Amino acid sequence: MGSSEQELTAIVRDLGCGPYFLGTFDKRFPGFVSRDRLSCAIVNTAGRETGGVHWLAFGWNPKSHTCYLFDPFGFSDQRLKQIYQFEYESLLRRSALAATKDRCVTLEKSTQTVQGPFSAACGLFCCMFLHAFTHWPDHPMDKNPTMDLLTGVPNCMLQSPQVVGTLQRNQNELYKFLNNLSPYFRHNRERIEKATSFTKMQNGLK
């Protein structure tokens, strides 16, 4: 089943992101409400009524006027639209970010894959990214102690047998990271790992 909204919220708070975390949202995320405040959110590509499909993480750094979009699969804009019918451009337009003085916002998006194709851990990877974002907001994607635990591979190799070992190690590193920093994860580890396992989505099963 992957991760529930309540679960992700509990883990994000354990990771120290609480003061900046706006919450979990479905595809109707209204955007960032304050252009002057460091803030972040976890957003699903589908409507809440569907039960959810895929989690993404967003972060806004007012100092650099940069909006970060983290997708554990590193899909291109076109693929996000093709697979999930999800577009974030309208999200940025209706956000308070459009009210910046020069209306100039830099979008930095993850382009590499860190999650296996059959893994259901997208929400947990988003929690990990938000830890990096709130602690190193000027370079949350890489070159920080959190995200450097993961090894990205080109998105075009997502289904390649050559990278299975790398992506499996990423998920193991993710679990170790959360086990170290999140009491909620520790107390519920067996259930969470079963629900988000590396092969959870194989054969189309959730």
Curated annotation (Swiss-Prot):
It is found in: Virion; Host nucleus. GO terms for biological process: proteolysis. Requires DNA and protease cofactor for maximal activation. Inside nascent virions, becomes partially activated by binding to the viral DNA, allowing it to cleave the cofactor that binds to the protease and fully activates it. Actin, like the viral protease cofactor, seems to act as a cofactor in the cleavage of cytokeratin 18 and of actin itself. InterPro entries: Papain-like_cys_pep_sf, Peptidase_C5. The keyword Protease applies. Induction: Expressed in the late phase of the viral replicative cycle. It catalyses: Cleaves proteins of the adenovirus and its host cell at two consensus sites: -Yaa-Xaa-Gly-Gly-|-Xaa- and -Yaa-Xaa-Gly-Xaa-|-Gly- (in which Yaa is Met, Ile or Leu, and Xaa is any amino acid). Gene3D superfamilies: Adenoviral Proteinase, Chain A. Its EC number is 3.4.22.39. The keyword rRNA-binding does not apply. Keywords: Autocatalytic cleavage, Disulfide bond, DNA-binding, Host nucleus, Hydrolase, Late protein, Protease, Thiol protease, Virion. Cleaves viral precursor proteins (pTP, pIIIa, pVI, pVII, pVIII, and pX) inside newly assembled particles giving rise to mature virions. Protease complexed to its cofactor slides along the viral DNA to specifically locate and cleave the viral precursors. Mature virions have a weakened organization compared to the unmature virions, thereby facilitating subsequent uncoating. Without maturation, the particle lacks infectivity and is unable to uncoat. Late in adenovirus infection, in the cytoplasm, may participate in the cytoskeleton destruction. Cleaves host cell cytoskeletal keratins K7 and K18. This is Protease. It comes from Human adenovirus A serotype 12 (HAdV-12). The gene is L3.
